[in-house]
Amino acid sequence: MRKLAGFFAALAALALAFRFGGGAQDVSELVPVQALVIDAQNGEITVTADTQDVGRGGSLDAALSDLRAGCAGTLFTQTAEHVVLTQKAWFLMPQVCVSAQLRPAAKLYRAVGQEITAERALSFLQAHPGELTLSRARAALLENKEVQAAVLVKTGGGFRLGG
């Protein structure tokens, strides 16, 4: 009787493991994101990753979900170190700061001027990171303080950070 109970317990554990994603996953399918650029135009939110993947939607969460769904592998937005909001998308900053799909320790930037791609901005931002994180921006919002994100400006040969 004990052996039979043990067999059914093992069978149930195996079934649960496969039911809830306990199966093996190929590591080459994992796509960690390091930088995201968020833009808004004509009521549509566009999120572009440094991996060249793009997501679109009517809300920030919908665009981030579309970004993950459109990727050939398993895309992780929670690994993003840098989040850049364009001038047109700055109104999304409070949503970005509280999004469960983004890493609270990610640095926050506001882009002005020309179009900025996540892929091109990544190497600059890694060498010259800003100081404001999403969690600090959220704290400032909760205290009714103005959020002062570093301003990312595209120059003729690269980028520049301003205050």
Language model segments and positions:
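Membrane-proximal alpha-helical signals and transmembrane carboxylates
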Residues: M1-G163
